[in-house]
Amino acid sequence: KIKKGDKAFVGSEFFGKMKWIADVNDDIYDPTYTDMLRVAFTSEFGRGKLQDLVALLSGRNFETKQYEDAIAEASFDKLKQGILAFVNKTHFDRITMILRSAGFILSNMIGSQNAINFAYILYLRGRRENVPAAELERMVRRWFAMSMLTGRYSGSPESTFDSDIRQIDSRGVIAYTDSVIPNELPDSFWTGMLPQFMDTSSISSPYFRCYQAAQIKLGDRGFLSRDITVTDLLLNRADVHH
């Protein structure tokens, strides 16, 4: 449809960089246009509010309150780099692989699109800071699980995105995540709060989803089974529903 209906886009460099998406069957991360803008903008500009993107593309100088052509031009250039990083196949494959390696192997196990969006932002920023691959993947997994368990991006996601990315800009991605995660998930969370949160019949509970992910990551067997894993059970159930 795009090839026939949007000749201008097909002729742009963006189409060539993202046409691989047509062959993707993985629905773990199925971003919208807004998700792409949010990740590209936040990771590249160090800001989390999309209204700031509109202002910057208009040439807004936040210090002088004036509008300058040079700022508009630089902002479009910067956004372009962010979008190209977002649609880079290697980057996209890596973030979905990280989610799967954390145990989140099905899309219905992920209740927060913004938790994935910020995980992708962390990944892109970590790459820019030259964080070693193994350390970066571990950090993104831990942050994503923390975001799911605490509902970090469920209330006012833009404000939280903005606060988090500014702290990352100031302190560096590893230092910031290493300080936040134990603060958000202290021992008392695991021993006191989480058992209470798990007392629910809802299978869409983020706590239950994270419990399933932990079982998958640890290779746990199904109840009263020697051979069938939790992974097998969940994948089989997903196949039946499809």
Which sequence ranges carry the predicted segments?
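Active-site-proximal structural scaffolding
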Residues: 7, 88, 92, 112-115, ...
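Intrinsically disordered, low-complexity N-proximal targeting/linker segments that flank membranes
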Residues: 148-241
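Solvent-exposed functional surfaces
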Residues: 1-188
